[in-house]
Amino acid sequence: MTKLTYYTATTLDGFIADHNDSLDWLMRQENDEDGPLNYTEFIEGIGAIVMGSTTYRWLLEHQPGEWAYEMPAWIMTSRELEMPGAPADVRFASGDVRPVYDAMAAAAGGKDLWVVGGGELAGAFADAGLLDELITYTAPVTLGRGRQILPRRILPAAWPCSGI
């Protein structure tokens, strides 16, 4: 069964991006490829991804060159995006996340789905009852303000705690 995971990093004070929507704090963190949050192992099981337009724009602007993802990607946006040089397998969508989930699941070829970011988008999937798993890495950093990991109340959480 395909599952949707919000796999993300957060600061000690609960932010995924700073007040300028930057992920620079995250790019300075070491990645433990042998630990429980092994990205390489995680991404091998992913068949489609979804992210908000702010995450998408940041990735294009700050990681120029070849698109980092080989699987189909959906970009959720409430505004018109003009992105010259957008990767070939990127689709833009807005509104209800349910049809996007269905399209992602169909395209994933039996693999899992990943909410890359941000927190508001992950919350929309949770509100729709579609978010199956939350995996977080907490970095030893504080930002004081910025984009929250989940900027809304989500109850009841049916996610078991598998490690701290």
Predicted segments, located by residue:
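Enzymes that bind and transform nitrogen-containing heteroaromatic metabolites
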Residues: 1-164
